Amino acid sequence: MSEKPFPIPDDVPTESPSAVHDRLVSDERFGVLDTRAPADVDDWRIDGDGVAFANVPYYEFLDGVPEDALAELPDARPLYTVCAKGLSSKYVADVLGDAGVDDVVAVEDGMEGWETVLEATELSADTDAAVVQFHRPSSGCLSYLIVDGDEALVVDPLHAFADEYVDAAAERGADLVAAVDTHVHADHVSGVRTLARDHGVRAVVPAAAAERGVDYAVDYDTVADGGTLTVGETVVEAVHTPGHTSGMTSYLVDDAVLLTGDGLFVESVARPDLEGGADGAPDAARRLYDTLHERILPLPDDTLVAPGHASDAAERADDGSFTDRLGYLAESMPALDRDREAFVEFVLDDMPPRPDNYEAIIATNLGDRRVDDEGVAELERGPNNCAATTDAMTEG
């Protein structure tokens, strides 16, 4: 349902999405009143352990504040109102304030503003290089900046934040020299081409992913299994880890940090159906099993796994990042202890809906489809569902 015309007050207290995110990360308790239609809220909302959440559509407030709506309001304060663009939420905040509800604050720009939040956390890792994890809370997407001396490389950059990676490298006294993807993404538009086009950064695509027919308007290099990229004095090794996609490639930094893309998460394993569909999923799941047991799990237990996504079920490490030691994941994730066919059955039985617009996003990332910034935002709106399950597979 589109938002109907109503007065938009200009004196309602507001707070930036970044400030709301900071409160969320601190586990401070607060309330969220989402004024979008229920169908828009079910799969994509601001949520967390400290959030008391309610959904009452804005149109319920067009004639004042109904008693049943008051009864549904979270008791936690502040109470943030949020909508799609920051319009109806201001109206509702104003109406609630007039009705005597205290400490109501509208989230600036609504969920569109929430999409612009990017959180940076430097990993506590046994590497000479600094490895910085970037987290987009609106989708759970994770990207990484590797900085050694005056050079930096970014892995799995998002188009929407291309300039931020360049700035982050500069803040650390480095030039961003290369951008590389782990695979052809299905949930967000890659920033590799954007960085090459706008900032002269070297574009790199996994050789196995390029075989799907990557057709960029900019020149790009490929890196094959066992090949290396260098950042300053740091060596980054490409490790072909198919399963989620045929071209899925992880990157081992200083033999200590494994950037697993969408192959292995800290709370789950990858879904296998986004490239070959339902018909190809069983064979892809078998490839994923082989990858996990032949290419990833044999690495040292203290290898730090740094994935490409974090779901709501993911827990933060002590340094605030979404990472974990490989040995812990091997012990705590029952899926990794199953035999091959039991693993395949388990993965195929528990998959969430495919990401919104995933076919159009794949086409865009292959270079078959062109979209502007507004089109990118529309394609990416909503949750990612690249994991095999929305629930944690880990125990403990």
Language model segments and positions:
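Accessory terminal helices/loops
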Residues: S2-P13, E28, A39, D94-D102, ...
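Positively charged, proline/Ser/Thr-rich regional signature most characteristic
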Residues: P7-R77
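Conserved beta-strand hairpin/beta-sheet module of binuclear metal-dependent hydrolase folds
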Residues: A37, L123-E171, Y251-G261, V266-E267
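Catalytic cysteine-centered active loop of the rhodanese-like fold, especially the PTP/DSP P-loop
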Residues: V56, G64-E112
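Ser/Thr-glycine-rich phosphate-binding loops at phosphate-binding pockets of nucleotides
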Residues: S89, V180-H183, T241, T245, ...
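Cysteine-dependent PTP/DSP-like catalytic domain, specifically the C-terminal lobe
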Residues: A106-S124
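Metallo-beta-lactamase
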Residues: A152, A160, A174-V177, E211, ...
